Amino acid sequence: MDRWIKITVEDVASYQAGAFVKALESKAKYSEQQENPVEVAIERITARIRSDVKSGGFSVDRDTDKIPAELSPDAIALVVEFAKPRLTLKLSDDERTLAAAARERLDKIATGKIKPSLPDNPEPAAESVQSSGGCALVRPARGTPQRSDYAGL
């Protein structure tokens, strides 16, 4: 079994009623040119999870669609929270609780308190680290000047 997985529309449908996913795919679209709202929600939540994993100083998978497998229930809860208002439906208390717990867990990962599983195909560090822009840090002189520092002046 892979340690990092891709969240799909079928995963959301199995977590939530399939009718909810069908309604999102048909009723929540304004036009035929608009993307599937469930796929957009999955894409945005996946990006947030990967960002939180990177913020914690952990490696991510090369495939930008993959997240740690243990975070899939959290991702699906956040996808539902993100997508449900598009149908002008209110979140249930359980859905709110699950989404809040998911955000709390992601915050702990971002601060390094929880370690996610290692990626199957890690992204090289050079790809995930921003360049500094070439700015040099100026440091103050070490210590307090002593009498010997002024000898000969």
Feature annotation, model-predicted:
Residues W4, E81-L153:
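Short loop/turn elements at secondary-structure junctions
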Residues M1-L71, S132-L153:
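Conserved short "hinge" loops at termini or chain/domain junctions
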Residues P73-F82:
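Elongated alpha-helical scaffolds
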